[in-house]
Amino acid sequence: MYSGICICLLLAMLSASSKAHQSEDAVVTEMDQLTLSQLPRYARASSAGQKKSFQRTDGDQRSNIGNVLVKYLQQSRKAGPSGRYVVLPNRPIFDQPHRINDRDYMGWMDFGRRSAEEYEYSS
């Protein structure tokens, strides 16, 4: 329930920010767009002092955020009655009761569960 509310708030913030960016883009004139696109963009280099070109990845970031949200929502729908979901499918969840197939075989002596009737006395 709490995670659903957080997701809704996150989606609302993302949609509001994208609407704000769209309205700002509508205000900028075509001439300003041409001058901005002709200027080179530079990002700060590590410590070498060299300039390197900066590429905008706003569209990529938006699509990546969308993909992450879709995966989260799909996993939250698959969540069991406990409300837990698996972030990484190959990570085991240790609180689920399951048999250990490689170590649970006939003849295995589990002293904590054996009853007195099953124990054979040699007399």
Swiss-Prot record:
GO terms for biological process: digestion. Residues 21-103, 115-123 form a propeptide. InterPro entries: CCK-like, Gastrin/CCK, Gastrin/cholecystokinin_CS. The precursor is cleaved by proteases to produce a number of active cholecystokinins. GO terms for molecular function: neuropeptide hormone activity. The modification Sulfotyrosine is found at residue 105. Keywords: Amidation, Cleavage on pair of basic residues, Hormone, Secreted, Signal, Sulfation. Pfam families: Gastrin. GO terms for cellular component: axon; extracellular space. It comes from the Eukaryota. It is found in: Secreted. Residues 1-20 form the signal peptide. The modification Phenylalanine amide is found at residue 111. Brain, gastrointestinal tract and lung. Disulfide bonds: none annotated. Belongs to the gastrin/cholecystokinin family. This is Cholecystokinin A.
